[in-house]
Amino acid sequence: MNHTKLKLSAVALTLALGLSACSGESPEKQVQSAESEQMKAVDVDKSMPMQSIESTAKRIGESAANWQIAQFGNLDYIPESHRAKSENAKFWIQASFYIGLTRWIDATDDKQLESFVKQVAEKENYELILERPYHADDHAIAQTYLWLAERAGVQEAYMPTKEVFDMILSKPPQVGLNMGDSESSSGKYHLEGNCQLRWCWADALFMAPRAWAQMTKVTSDPKYLEYGNKEFWAAADYLFSDEYGLFFRDSRYFDAKSDNGEPVFWGRGNGWVFAAIPMIIEELPEGHPSKDRYIELYKKHAEGLMALQKEDGYWPASLMDPDKVRTPEVSGTGFITFGLAWGVNNGILTDQRSKDVVEKGWSAITKAVTDDGRVNWVQHVGKSPDPVKESDSQLYGTGAVLLAASEMLIWNK
């Protein structure tokens, strides 16, 4: 196989020209009062004409994808603490962007963007990060490789991932899901705890389960989906609160309280899971026995989330304590808006309230994207509600916006 010799930055520049002619601190320390910076007023339309939504989705999706791609090789706007990892295409930060980008490609059939994704995957030799092969974060890029395998029928696109998954199946992890009972490790690719050999934190349910379902689809071997399905439900049953209809980030937050005395439910953490559920459902074989269970969880989570949307259309970084971080937060809002829009578009959420919440969320998202496509107001890498500035931008935030735009492109059709 002839691999491209282009550097990622060069690939990005070529495409852009053609198209445009987790810290270890305790929850108490992580959940701090928001910065005193005043949020700019955000005017959110109560309703948007259908033609306006479709045209806005097309504009936002195209500009966000193009802007983000043009930044590769020049990610100076990202804090130095996470810049190197953001530049690594195999790491979850960039992989989350590709999950949104491939969804956008499916919606638009954009061949130039598809070519870009192929070149990135070839440059990485379709490989995962192997320093911690069990870690869900490092399975996120597999979703793009498997997307390419299914779309183009290229066997080499999924073989390295298959080798890793087969190893995991041969030596399945024998640890519990309690983050507090496990030991952390240091290093470039660290573990918050040994439980991360499994999917013991909310983010993991976005990063890994869909890839295991995709592997079954491309290989026709049910063992991958069986493992992914089992581990998803182990984590979901452990982290989901039936009382609130929300996911705890991990076990360390079961008893944590925000400043107002309410439980700590992280906006983006819930967004990760809520965006993942529709994409997992789509990968299930016809008649899969767990489909109804996924839809039931989706509905419970949707109800919990819809009740917490702010008047400005955003979901707060701290879902039960909106005063903790008063500024917009677009990554969580993007993931949640995508999930809700998917439910409306697929006839699962049929009431007018759901439609209104989606349109309000989408209108808020559009206010956070600049004319040239930069996605602002994105909370940086973390695991709990942290302060957000307007200039904060990250690849997964763009991925979230692309997911939402892909559904708004077909809104109510």
From Swiss-Prot:
Lipid group attachment sites (S-diacylglycerol cysteine): C22
Superkingdom assignment: Bacteria
UniProt-recorded name of the protein: Unsaturated 3S-rhamnoglycuronyl hydrolase
EC number(s) given by UniProt: 3.2.1.-
Top EC group: hydrolase
Keyword field contains Methyltransferase: no
Classification via Pfam families: Glyco_hydro_88
MF (Gene Ontology): hydrolase activity
Primary localization: membrane
Keywords on record: Cell membrane, Hydrolase, Lipoprotein, Membrane, Palmitate, Signal
UniProt function note: Glucuronyl hydrolase involved in ulvan degradation. Ulvan is the main polysaccharide component of the Ulvales (green seaweed) cell wall. It is composed of disaccharide building blocks comprising 3-sulfated rhamnose (Rha3S) linked to D-glucuronic acid (GlcA), L-iduronic acid (IduA), or D-xylose (Xyl).
Catalytic residue list: D203
BP GO terms, sorted: carbohydrate metabolic process
UniProt cross-references to SUPFAM superfamilies, sorted A to Z: Six-hairpin glycosidases (SSF48208)
Lipidation (N-palmitoyl cysteine): C22
